[in-house]
Amino acid sequence: MRNVTRSHMVLHQIQSVLKKYEEVSAQELYESLDKGTVQREFGVRSVDLSRLSVSEEQFSELLLLFKLYSDQQQQSSIEFVATVPSEVDVRLRKTIAVIREMIHGAQNTILVTGYAVSEYVDEIMERVLEKALAGVNVDIFLDRNPQTDRYIENIRGRNLPSNFNVYVYKGSQGYSSLHAKVIMVDEEKAFVSSANLSYNGIVNNIEIGTLVGGEKILVIKNVLLELVKNNYFEKIIWYA
């Protein structure tokens, strides 16, 4: 029991140091360890190691191992997702389950792009609106078509918050429609799929997508922001 308690104390101290120096790279930490300066540069000497029964060298090495593990966890991750017949055993999560989980878990931002938004996904889009009302910043990018018009008219006149933004693709010569299907939450995870936000896309068609994590997904948002900047989208104004 004593060893378990000590392990928790060591872990807590390591996490505290890593949080304090989270901007420092693992390479910098390794170089300091190699030079024998990690104790001074990273505040290890301020830690009461006598209570932990570890030496400065042991603590520093553990610090580096946890930093390497933390950096590895933050790198890009990919999970495949599919809409397939129930009798097909592909051991992949279903599209609808992933979409609901992402929206439910969003804390800061939600970004949605789609070609079609049918009545079938009204419940999902309602959850997105509820998140906006709770303070989550929402940006929705849609193609111009009858389904988009229906969705906009359905929510127009409601008490929509200023952080709930809908952009409609204007169309341009050579680029006839917005066909990208992406859901991104908290700028940490992006679901990129062939599936439209419709019954066919989520239930009836065979669709494959990827759930991607990591900093590289911000490229998606940057592309959309550049399109907005270059006047490819019309922002819907809810109030005159």
From Swiss-Prot:
Keywords for this protein: Antiviral defense, Cytoplasm, Hydrolase, Restriction system
Organism domain of life: Bacteria
GO biological process terms, semicolon-separated: cardiolipin biosynthetic process; defense response to virus; DNA restriction-modification system
GO molecular function: hydrolase activity; phosphatidyltransferase activity
Pfam families: PLDc_2
Residues at the active site: 179, 181, 186
Protein location: Cytoplasm
Coiled-coil stretches: none
Enzyme category, top tier: hydrolase
Limits of the PLD phosphodiesterase domain: 174-201
UniProt-listed Enzyme Commission number(s): 3.1.-.-
Family: Belongs to the phospholipase D family.
Protein name in UniProt: DISARM protein DrmC
Species: Bacillus paralicheniformis (strain ATCC 9945a / NCIMB 11709 / CD-2)
Lineage summary: Bacteria, Bacillati, Bacillota, Bacilli, Bacillales
Gene transcribed to yield this protein: drmC
